[in-house]
């Protein structure tokens, strides 16, 4: 979470820097260039000077796998965002930048093949985190807010209570044993 905040601050700082540069360039009159077209044209020229040509910002509409020519303009948003076609997102291996890799479903990016267990679709790192969260055992994990529902959850709750009951000594002074005569 802290990393996201830091990244966001950095992004906002960069964005503010670009805004300041644009305003500064506009105030200076583009360093003696002639004004032909108004504020909007001027702003575009300044933005191009600050950020670089707009062609650098246009994302590729093709799958990033080597020699794949699938056009992603009609693909689902997920595939466009990650620049991978549906076939290569589910493939056991693909060549990206000359290296054999597999698309990780958890990270939504390509990893080298040794980072996966056998035919798994998630890298070891993300899979380990997922399994850790699944197996986490704490007092809160069996409460109402847990993801466990139904009979098996009730059975686990009962087993946990029995374990606790067996460990508690019977030293309560208000407890009276029934006497059989």
Curated annotation (Swiss-Prot):
Residues reported to bind Zn(2+) 1: 63, 68, 85, 88
Keywords assigned by UniProt, alphabetized: Cytoplasm, DNA-binding, Metal-binding, Nucleus, Transcription, Transcription regulation, Zinc, Zinc-finger
Subcellular compartments: Nucleus; Cytoplasm
Residue stretches of biased makeup (Acidic residues): 22-39
Taxonomic lineage of the native organism: Eukaryota, Viridiplantae, Streptophyta, Embryophyta, Tracheophyta
Comment field on protein domains: The SBP-type zinc finger is required for the binding to DNA.
Name of the protein this chain belongs to: Squamosa promoter-binding-like protein 5
Induction conditions: Negatively regulated by microRNAs miR156.
């Amino acid at each position: 979470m802290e990393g996201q905040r830091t990244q966001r601050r950095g992004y906002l700082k960069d964005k503010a820097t670009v805004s300041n540069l644009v305003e500064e360039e506009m105030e200076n009159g583009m360093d003696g260039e002639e004004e032909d077209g108004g504020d909007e044209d001027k702003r575009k020229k300044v933005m191009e000077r600050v950020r670089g040509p707009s062609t650098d910002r246009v994302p590729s509409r093709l799958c990033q796998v080597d020699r794949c020519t699938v056009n992603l303009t009609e693909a689902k948003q997920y595939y466009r965002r990650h620049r991978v076609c549906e076939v290569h997102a589910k493939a056991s291996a693909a060549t990206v930048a000359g290296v054999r890799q597999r698309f990780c479903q958890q990270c939504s990016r390509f990893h080298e093949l040794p980072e996966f267990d056998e035919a798994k679709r998630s890298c070891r790192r993300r899979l380990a985190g997922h399994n850790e969260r699944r197996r986490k055992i704490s007092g809160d994990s069996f409460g109402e807010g847990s993801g466990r529902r139904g009979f098996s959850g009730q059975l686990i709750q009962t087993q946990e209570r029995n374990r606790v009951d067996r460990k508690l000594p019977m030293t309560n002074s208000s407890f009276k044993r029934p006497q059989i005569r």
